[in-house]
Amino acid sequence: MSEDIFDAIIVGAGLAGSVAALVLAREGAQVLVIERGNSAGAKNVTGGRLYAHSLERIIPGFADQAPIERMITHEKLAFMTDNGAMTIDYCNGEDASASQVSYSVLRSKFDAWLMEQAEEAGAQLITGIRVDNVVQRDGKVVGVEADGDILEAKVVILADGVNSLLAEKLGMTKRVEASHVAVGVKELIELPKLVIEDRFQLQGNEGAACLFAGAPTDGLMGGGFLYTNETTLSLGLVCGLHHLKDAKKSVPQMLEDFKQHPAVAPLIAGGKLVEYAAHVVPEAGMNMQPELVGDGVLIAGDAAGMCMNLGFTIRGMDLAISAGEAAAKTVLSAMKRDDFSKQSLGEYRQHLDEGPMRDMRMYQKLPAFLDNPRMFTAYPEMAVNIARDLFTVDGSAPVPMRKKILRHAKKVGFINLMKDGLKGVTVL
């Protein structure tokens, strides 16, 4: 092949794309990354939690040099009604290994740093350019068309986000279904470092991750989130796109009401809004995955549906990193064989099965389980009402605790409780 042909062209400088570029460049591959934003991370929106295990494997001790915000040591899961909340609070005071922890991050900073690591290893980055088409020759992907220029490569890695038009043009995926994605909105609220630590009972670089179900999305599938950064809070909500047709409020109004909730307002009081962003995020996991491998092409990251909403936590960044690493390993093996056919690149699935797909397969039925209106209406209301009755003393004749609980459980329906409980046991 000509010297003008790259070993790999990667579309998208998010986590999957940057990691793929880093791993490839370390082995001497000629890599070009094309990012439509003005910088790596400019187009990325996330709540902001990175589970460290996948990147720790690639860059040991990365937290010592990367622009992380806080190490998550406090977990809060709240069930909310319009005026109340019942919260499960967990604090981890034990020492954990570098691969067991998680961090709050700001993607604009973190992605830029990660791409810098790839560039230092030898990868090339072009920003502010949109890839319009994938170039094919005799049914095989041989490059991309960007800004009117044809750039050739032995293999193309598509890491261009949840709504990958390039994968759609190749026929590797269908147009994204509304039931497979959610609309996410996020505000970045600035507060003094010591104020954040005082309000969330943190010390040093400790951080908190908070998830909220019920009222934030007005009873629709989704939820609210809050992550503590060093001097800011990442606050927002995510709502299933196909449920918005039934919404009585707009998503911006949901966010405003969420901010005014008595369980949230004191946490953000006095804060200054410094950033607002909205984005479409994958929600269906394996149920929305495209064909991941083609002749001369691989798909990774959000474009490959690498996201898991487990209810009690949300994962996406660590899966994207693992997918980027898997894509790079696959390309390196293909380079040794000088074979970039679909069959040769099929090794990608094996690498994924040993990493992110293993986790995603275990929870692949969970999205359907969570797509149950009782999860965001009846159950939060039941939890809050039970807590209210347990903690209220008004001088009236005492009622046995079991009767208080049964009274509210009856409103949900014992058959519904049994049915949902059994289904939950089978999917978790």
Curated annotation (Swiss-Prot):
UniProt key word tRNA processing: no
InterPro entries, sorted: FAD-bd, FAD/NAD-bd_sf, FixC-like
Keywords from the UniProt entry: Electron transport, FAD, Flavoprotein, Oxidoreductase, Transport
Domain of life: Bacteria
Keyword Transport included in the entry's annotation: yes
The protein's required cofactors: FAD
GO molecular function (one): FAD binding
Pfam family membership, one: FAD_binding_3
Family of the protein in this entry: Belongs to the ETF-QO/FixC family.
Function: Could be part of an electron transfer system required for anaerobic carnitine reduction.
Family matches, as NCBIfam families: PRK10015.1, PRK10157.1
Protein name (Swiss-Prot/TrEMBL): Protein FixC
Native species: Salmonella typhimurium (strain LT2 / SGSC1412 / ATCC 700720)
Gene field: fixC
